[in-house]
Amino acid sequence: MSAPVLVVDDLSVRFAGAPAAVVEGLSFTVQPGRTLALVGESGCGKSVTSMALMGLLPATAEVRAHQASFMGEDLLGMPEARRRDLRGDRLAMVFQEPMTSLNPAFTVGEQLMETVLRHRGGSQSAARQRALEMLEKVRVPAATQRLAAYPHELSGGMRQRVMIAMALANDPALIIADEPTTALDVTIQAQILELIASLQAETGSAMILITHDLGVVAEVADEMAVMYAGRVVESGPVAQLFDDPQHPYTLGLMGSMPSLGPRTGRLATIAGRVPTPVEMPAGCRFASRCPFVLDACRVAPPPLVELAPGQQVACLRAPLEQHLETPA
């Protein structure tokens, strides 16, 4: 097997003055050509994780890890100049809000060319040709004319295609896609997902996909890590977790998904709400909402244990099949 593109071991993020870490004990590996989805509801720490890896958090953030290795280099320990060299080159990001991610004062072509010139060098004409190639690759119609367009002259879907072109312009080893379809309508979402998947297959890039949408996960991801209140509660191959979720939170997420077929009742909901940093419990952070909770769950965080090859779950009641008929 090829060496992993990214190895993260025990990543934690805490902001100055905060009573608890917003990300705690996060560990995962991303292999070449594979897609890992970080899944969870708003505020679970998905985007903070991505910004920590990119080095884009404010100075008030304290980021620690036993290991955060990108292609053999220490992401957290490297000089800022080296990190700037990696960002936009071997390590790229597609942000979730295409309407505000591009600079309104510069044309699309100027912004694409800047990315190429910053990391590849070469002439203006070569950079312009590369920018044109990338717009054509992401299927922007009338690509030559679009080079001279300003962001406000493009639709949201077109802007997101430009963001994808910019991320892929220098053939990155890893793409971090933070909710890349959130601001788009359903039809455009499907087109963007298909585009990302085809370009990833073409380039062999690895990807971290950040999303709350399990439908998106099923469409494009190979592995998934389910996050709740800053911690991973379950991880494993996508097909395995969809077929046999073993954490009560994962089970609740699956139960809340709408289906195309006939429904006999209401969609499932998860009672309660995510604890704020002030309310973080000593034990399992899902305990206050869990129908299977034990007294021991409130004492200490349950460790991630392997239930099946590749599938890990942080739950004292796993496997849940033993308790589905008799919740506590």
Question: Residue locations for each model-derived region?
Answer:
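ABC ATPase NBD coupling module
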Residues: L75-A92, E110, R118, Q124, ...
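Conserved ABC transporter NBD signature motif
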Residues: E62-D74
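Conserved ABC ATPase signature
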Residues: A149-L154, M158
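Conserved structural motif at the start of ABC-family nucleotide-binding domains
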Residues: L6-V8, V23, L86
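Short catalytic/signature loops enriched in Gly
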Residues: P4, P141-Q145, S235-A328
